[in-house]
């Protein structure tokens, strides 16, 4: 994980622990109909993870790529481990893996990003998950979404995003297709109510 990302996470801001929900007029196709969990926000910028974009790689693919097991071992992995979900976390540093997880797993490299959720970006958690010793709730994301100083605030002011407090159940839900509508429902909003001219929360 890049040092500047770690620094950003340690600097807390008012959007920490919030969902960003893309408005219909989102100009950047990377973020159309996305739900993003903001892990860090400060005067230096912001960092978060897209929660509803699939990733073609499987967890065994990741283990093989990292040389944490050989092909014969991959075949013998428990079904729960083989089916561990990998998601596309954002367009920045797409070759880097990050694990968002419940706070029942902590290592020296785990960073709290909300009251109940941590972020770990080292191989120890990948090994733990492969052995069935990982956190109760977790999702692995490749890449992240990042904003420079003032950039996210400007996008919100320009009606690019709705914001609301994050919900743990939605963060770890495996049903990616429903996350956008479910995030809107947290605010009492339906997609039909939105237009490109709507205001922000």
From Swiss-Prot:
Domain of life: Bacteria
One CC-aspect GO term: cytosol
One Pfam family recorded for the sequence: DUF179
InterPro entries assigned to the protein according to its UniProt record, in alphabetical order: AlgH-like
Family: Belongs to the UPF0301 (AlgH) family.
Name listed for the protein in its UniProt record: UPF0301 protein R00917
Upper classification of the organism: Bacteria, Pseudomonadati, Pseudomonadota, Alphaproteobacteria, Hyphomicrobiales
């Amino acid at each position: 994980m890049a040092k500047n990302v770690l620094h950003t996470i340690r600097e807390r801001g008012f959007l920490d622990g919030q969902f960003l929900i893309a408005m219909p007029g989102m100009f950047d196709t990377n973020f159309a109909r996305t739900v993003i969990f903001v892990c860090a926000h400060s005067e230096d910028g912001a960092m978060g993870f897209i929660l509803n974009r699939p990733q073609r790689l499987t967890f065994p693919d990741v283990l093989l790529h990292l040389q944490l097991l050989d092909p014969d071992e991959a075949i013998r992995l428990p079904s729960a481990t083989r089916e561990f979900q990998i998601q596309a976390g954002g367009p920045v540093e797409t070759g880097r893996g990050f694990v968002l997880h419940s706070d029942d797993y902590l290592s020296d490299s785990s960073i709290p990003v909300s009251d109940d959720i941590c972020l770990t970006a080292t191989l120890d958690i990948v090994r733990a998950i492969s052995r069935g010793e990982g956190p109760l709730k977790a999702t692995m994301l490749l890449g992240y979404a990042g904003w420079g100083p003032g950039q996210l605030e400007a996008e919100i002011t320009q009606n690019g995003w709705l914001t609301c407090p994050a919900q743990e159940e939605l963060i770890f839900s495996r049903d990616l297709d429903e996350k956008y509508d479910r995030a809107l429902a947290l605010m009492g909003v339906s997609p039909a109510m939105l237009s490109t001219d709507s205001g922000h929360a």
